[in-house]
Amino acid sequence: MAAIRKKLVIVGDGACGKTCLLIVFSKDQFPEVYVPTVFENYVADIEVDSKQVELALWDTAGQEDYDRLRPLSYPDTDVILMCFSIDSPDSLENIPEKWTPEVKHFCPNVPIILVGNKKDLRNDEHTRRELTKMKQEPVKAEEGRDMANRIGAFGYMECSAKTKDGVREVFEMATRAALQARRGKKSNKCCLL
C-alpha cells in the first residue's frame, strides 16, 4: 500500500529553531552550525494511527528579506508548523503580529500547530541571565497554550531539537492534523467546458 503524502510547511522568526527541528526529525542529527535558510525541502516517513505517511517538509526563511519569496512555498500545504523560540519572547509576539496573518492569508483553513522550540533553554542559567538584562524571561508553557487558543491553532507543542525531547510528538500531531483536515475538506474543484 502506497504511503499517503502530506505537505508540511514550517514558519517562524529567523533563528527560532525551524531547520534544527526538521533536520533532527528527518535525519536524526542536530546541526551545530547556524546557516540561515532560504528554501530547503526534506522528506520523512512517519506512521500515525496505523497509517504510513510521507511528509514533505518545506523549510522557509524567517528573515524579512524573504517575505516576498516565502509565499511560493504555501500552495497545496496540508499543515503548518508555526514556531517561536522559548528563549525569545519577541518571537512569540510575532506569532499574532506577522505569522498568523500571513499564513491565514495564503493558507486559509490549513491546520496550524503552534510549536515552542528550544524548550531546553527555559531553565538554562545563561539564557535566563541574558533575558533578565532585557527585562524579559523565557516563554512559559501557559503563554504558549494561550497563544495557540488565540490564533485558533489545532494544537500546541513544545520541543527541544537539541535533546530530541518532544520532536516526534510535534510531527505526530502535525500528521494527525493534516489527515483530519483532508477528510473534512469538501472538494471545490470545478470543470470548465
From Swiss-Prot:
Presence of the UniProt keyword Manganese in the record: no
MF GO annotations: GTP binding; GTPase activity; protein kinase binding
Removed propeptide positions: 191-193
Membrane-spanning ranges: none
GO cellular-component term (any): plasma membrane
Residues carrying lipid (S-geranylgeranyl cysteine): C190
A family per Pfam: Ras
Glycosylated residue positions: Y34
Binding-site positions, GTP: 12-19, 30-37, 59-63, 117-120, 160-162
Record-linked CDD domains: RhoA_like
Protein keywords: Cell membrane, Glycoprotein, GTP-binding, Lipoprotein, Membrane, Methylation, Nucleotide-binding, Prenylation
Post-translational modification: (Microbial infection) Glycosylated at Tyr-34 by Yersinia ruckeri toxin Afp18. Mono-O-GlcNAcylation by Afp18 inhibits RhoA activation by guanine nucleotide exchange factors and blocks RhoA signaling.
UniProt superkingdom: Eukaryota
Bilayer topology annotation: Lipid-anchor
Localization per record: Cell membrane
Main location: membrane
BP GO terms, sorted: actin filament organization; cell migration; cell migration involved in gastrulation; establishment of mitotic spindle localization; negative regulation of apoptotic process; otolith development; post-anal tail morphogenesis; regulation of actin cytoskeleton organization
Keyword Glycoprotein annotated: yes
Modified residues annotated as Cysteine methyl ester in this record: C190
Function (record text): Regulates a signal transduction pathway linking plasma membrane receptors to the assembly of focal adhesions and actin stress fibers.
Family: Belongs to the small GTPase superfamily. Rho family.
NCBIfam families found in the cross-reference section: small_GTP
Protein known as: Rho-related GTP-binding protein RhoA-B
Gene name tied to this protein: rhoab
